[in-house]
Amino acid sequence: MQKWAVEQLKCQRKKEIGTSTVTLNKHLKTNKMKKIFIYSLLSFLWIGNLVAQQTPAVQQTQAYSIEGATAHLGTGEVIENSLLIFNNGKIIFVGKATAKIARQGTRIDATGKHVYPGLIAANASLGLVEIDAVRATDDEDEVGSMLPHIRSLIAYNAESKVVESMRPNGVLMGQITPRGGTISGTSSVVQFDAWNWEDAAIKKDDAIHINWPGSLTRGRWWMGEDPALKLDPKYGENVQKIVTYFADAKRYLSSNQKVENIPFSATKGLFNGSQKLFIHANGEKEITDAVTKMKVIGINNLVLVHGKGAENVANLLLKNNIPVVIERSHRIPEGEDDDFDLSYRKAKILMDKGITIGIGMEGQMERMNTRNLPFYAGTYAAYGVGKEDALKMITSNNAKILGIDSFVGSLEVGKDATLFISEGDALEMKGNILTDAFVQGRKISLETHQTKLWKRYTNKYKTN
């Protein structure tokens, strides 16, 4: 019996070992298959992403001569039958095609077409958000209230498909601006053909942005409160917080700074004039308070953004040389009693007051709608602003407001060859058909994932 029991135990042990071995082998095979699947998926995604990425153009190696086009210089001047030559990324000649000057490099016959400086989108958040519904792709709004040290530039995604889709409409540069909080952070200006944010930057940390509080408030109707406008009892307190913050920052900068304060250090450019303060404000009282209190503190380089009611305080803005970045023209009136077309006439009203005007992009679906920048200017042109003045609002005026007018914003000798050729009027949807575009002299691709899909499905339904 004992011998039989021992044999039974041996058989049972062998079965257990065999079963464990089989289970272990299955487990190893399963893990191996998982690894193969994961590696294959990562490889697929990496290759797919590589193929999908826009490839920045190579540095200019030969000159270009654009001849015969109507040149819109961005200064208000137009040259019919023009000649424009650029080399090494810089414009070296702008004039009539009848000029007796040797053409250089590749000649582009642009007879019947139009050439423009690259359009500039001010107060935009391109490259900071890719998909609104995916929080991981949203870098436009940082946690906190007073954030002058938050730099939008380092979060800018140069490979964004949204940024890429701006170029076929002639939008080649933009001011990348953070959102949210009282002091949102620091913006920078970039060009839209780059490998990374370092290559994209054409002016780093150009301005700090502040959202000025409103003096009026509404009750929360969903909680049974009166929805009518009334004075905000906390307005004075909110304004004082801003004044105190900048006053403290100024005192810190004038001290020996034994203990580092990064947010205060970030405001240095506001006090020495190397940076601008973009004040996002609406209402005569708000604008007046913002300008007056910032001037008292010692911040003099100011830009007004939005500026509802700015026409009523035009003398204050002119006296202090403050330009206004107005909102897009394609929007409904803000006030219940506003004229139905006030949004379209806003530029004309302010321009007649002598105020320098640029167009900003903040608003609903602002990143996708930035491609419509030339058409916003076109609508302002249709409502009283001349075509060339409307063009200035998105070229030389925006360049001046952003502090980059010494090298971009107009077609002038010595400036960057950032420009494009359009078959028709670039401020009209039917005419804005680009044939060529250049950024700092580099001939860039006008293909995007959208144009590829357009061509694909156009061919599908094309009749023979």
Regions inferred by a protein language model and the residue ranges of each:
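Bacterial Sec-dependent N-terminal signal peptides
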Residues: 1, 5, 9-13, 18-59
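His/Asp/Glu-enriched, well-ordered alpha-helical/loop segment
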Residues: 68, 131-132, 137-143, 149, ...
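Divalent metal-coordination and catalytic microenvironments
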Residues: 69, 84, 89, 112, ...
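C-terminal cap of metal-dependent C-N hydrolases
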Residues: 69-72, 80, 412-457
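Histidine-rich, glycine-flanked metal-binding segment
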Residues: 71, 75-116
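Polyanionic/metal-chelating signatures
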Residues: 162, 169-301
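Glycine-enriched alpha-helix->loop->beta-strand junction motifs that scaffold or abut catalytic
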Residues: 294-301, 318-325, 354-356
